């Protein structure tokens, strides 16, 4: 039981960490788009920024997936915790 609660706390921390990473990525995307708005960019620099933007978009999508999976694990963990509580209370 205590292990399940400790596991849930670790998941909460992982979600917070990934959300912080995602916030940084969103900021980098905004900065990259601002740079791309400059019409006087050299074509090589523009291509490089477009590649960076594509990578940032993919990184953000991966963080969203990770957050979603961690939340699924938390829901499952809660269900198991509730099940164990009910199971142990019936034994007593």
Tell me the role of every PLM-derived stretch.
Residues 1-3, 83-92:
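Short acidic DE-rich linear segments
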Residues 1-26:
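Short, charge/polar-rich alpha-helical segments
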Residues 6, 19, 43, 89-90:
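Intrinsically disordered, low-complexity regulatory regions of eukaryotic regulatory proteins
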Residues 39-40, 78, 84, 88:
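Short, flexible coil/linker elements and helix-boundary hinge sites characteristic
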